[in-house]
A protein has these predicted regions:
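Conserved HGGG/HGGXW glycine-rich cap/lid loop of the alpha/beta-hydrolase fold
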Residues: 62-109
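Active-site loop/oxyanion-hole signature of alpha/beta-hydrolase fold enzymes
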Residues: 51, 58-60, 101-142, 310
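Flexible "cap/lid" loop of the alpha/beta hydrolase fold
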Residues: 156, 165-194
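Alpha/beta-hydrolase fold catalytic core
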Residues: 1-67, 94-97, 137, 317-318
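Catalytic active-site module of serine/aspartate enzymes centered on a nucleophile-bearing elbow/loop
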Residues: 288-289, 293-318
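Short beta-strand/loop motif that positions the catalytic acidic residue
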Residues: 258, 264-266
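Acidic catalytic loop of the alpha/beta-hydrolase fold
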Residues: 269-273
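Conserved alpha/beta-hydrolase catalytic His-Asp/Glu region
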Residues: 35-38, 178-180, 198-257
């Protein structure tokens, strides 16, 4: 019996030793959100108390615009992903748009929600509650990746509030053969993914971003640091993991019910959500336009911000 137990004990001891080494080398504590606010909540950032959270948002441009542009970011991202696009649109004297963007629950400086609910209906309700607080009655809603999925679901739930939709590499259809980022792959693995609560080295974020961006020159030290630090914001890692654990497939049949004019923007080299999905959206949404960006990855608003900003402006002004 003792001889039979020895290999098992040896394996367990080796596993524990590896864990100890990993924790001693790579384990990182959460960063207090108040500390991160000093760096990432500069003007025009504001905070809105909503649903037990302090929602980080920015409201820029023409305050009299009757139909603001709402921008939603993707998983493990933040409102900062739209910085360059917003700057171009707001600075255009011909475009008198109001642009509102915010950190979704689980991400950025908004952080986790008290209910620990990250299902699709929760996000739809959150967006509606946020827009109601700002007294937004009509809007154009735009989103990337997770944010894109939230955008079209919100448009279906509240068609009277949405004039137009803009989808950038959006979720919606079952994923097939995509490579996915290293971070997302680990987050999807049962049991092992719990290590991400403590071990999220900057090198992992860099490796993931190198999958997200087609042009690796965009994976700068500043960009890696931003994604890494905001992931480490207190509670965000646990919230992100909860999101992955609770994630359920969307119903692509619902997409055919979208009536609003829709602009579909896609990076042709997207390794997370294949460009094939862009053509599915185009096929299923009757009143839609498709804009494919060659040599661009999963987040075109960062990698090809000039073309994205111009496409958005042209679409809104139609």
């Amino acid at each position: 019996m003792k001889k039979m137990m020895r290999p098992l004990l040896y394996t367990l001891s080796s596993f524990l030793l590896v864990l100890i080494i990993l924790f001693s080398v790579y384990a990182q504590r959460d960063i207090p959100v108040e500390k991160l606010k000093l760096k990432y909540a500069q003007s025009p950032s504001k905070f809105l108390p909503l649903m037990g959270m302090q929602v980080h948002y920015r409201d820029e441009g023409n305050p009299n615009d009757p139909s603001p542009l709402i921008l939603l970011h993707g998983t493990s991202s933040s409102l900062n992903t739209w910085d360059s696009v917003v700057k171009i649109i707001v600075s255009n004297p011909k475009n008198k748009k109001r642009i509102i963007r915010f950190d979704l629950p689980a991400f950025g400086l908004t952080g986790p929600n008290p209910e620990n609910d990250y299902a699709s209906p929760y996000y739809t309700n959150f967006v509606d509650s946020f827009l109601n607080m700002l007294q937004i009655k009509k809007c154009t809603i735009s989103g990337n990746s997770l944010g894109g999925g939230i955008a079209w679901q919100y448009a279906l739930a509240h068609p009277e509030k949405v004039n137009k939709i803009i989808l950038l590499d959006a979720t919606g259809y079952p994923q097939k053969n995509e490579k996915g980022s290293l971070g997302f792959k680990i987050a999807s693995l049962p049991i092992i993914n719990n290590l991400l609560l403590f071990i999220t080295p900057k090198s992992l974020i860099k490796k993931s971003l190198e999958t997200v961006f087609y042009d690796k020159s965009f994976v700068t030290e500043a960009t890696v640091t931003r994604y890494h630090e905001l992931l480490l914001s207190a509670g965000n890692r646990r919230a992100t993991l909860s999101l992955f654990k609770s994630r359920r497939p969307l119903n692509p049949k619902e997409i055919k019910s979208i009536q609003q004019p829709t602009l579909i923007i896609w990076g042709e080299q997207d390794q997370l959500i294949s460009v094939d999905n862009a053509y599915l959206f185009k096929q299923d949404i009757k009143n839609s336009q498709l804009f494919i960006l060659p040599n661009v990855g999963h987040i075109p608003m960062e990698e090809s911000y000039v073309k994205v900003a111009n496409a958005i402006q042209n679409f809104i002004n139609q």
